[in-house]
A protein has these predicted regions:
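Juxtamembrane or sensor-core-proximal signal-transducing alpha helices
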Residues: 1-5
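Histidine- and acidic-residue-rich, metal-dependent catalytic cores
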Residues: 8-127
């Protein structure tokens, strides 16, 4: 019963986070849903456990939350970012992660989100 209550609280929190993203960028909600669908399908093909699939699904759905502190004009910017813009993007990402780290219900989700801007070739950030 306690586990169900905790899951319900986490689901409610995830919905609030999704609404926050939706308020900043209405197209982001559909994007988040597509990312979740593709991520879960990939996780199934990799035979992830049920709990890992749930974590992946949640992380994929709320991945835009880490960008909430991103200046709005960066969201639709075309072309390469300047060094100053890269620094701002990284800092906004770090602040978004810090915001989510204050939510113990999302500890595993945050562990996944920390790598959302990493690339297979080792480029990207934060590492």
């Amino acid at each position: 019963r306690l586990r169900m209550r905790l899951r319900s609280m986490r689901d409610g929190l995830v919905n609030v986070l999704a609404e926050m993203v939706d308020l900043k960028d209405p197209l982001a909600r559909r994007h988040a849903e597509r990312v979740r669908e593709h991520s879960v399908e990939l996780g199934r093909r990799l035979d992830l456990s049920g709990s890992d699939l749930q974590t992946l699904s949640t992380a994929a759905f709320v991945h835009e939350v880490v960008d909430l502190r991103m200046p709005a004009h960066f969201l639709g910017k075309n072309g390469p970012a300047s060094e100053i813009e890269h620094q701002l993007i990284r800092r906004s990402f770090e602040l978004g992660i810090q915001m989510l780290e204050d939510l113990p219900e999302l500890e595993e989700v945050v562990a996944v989100l920390k790598f959302v801007h990493e690339h297979f070739d080792g480029s990207g950030f934060p590492n």
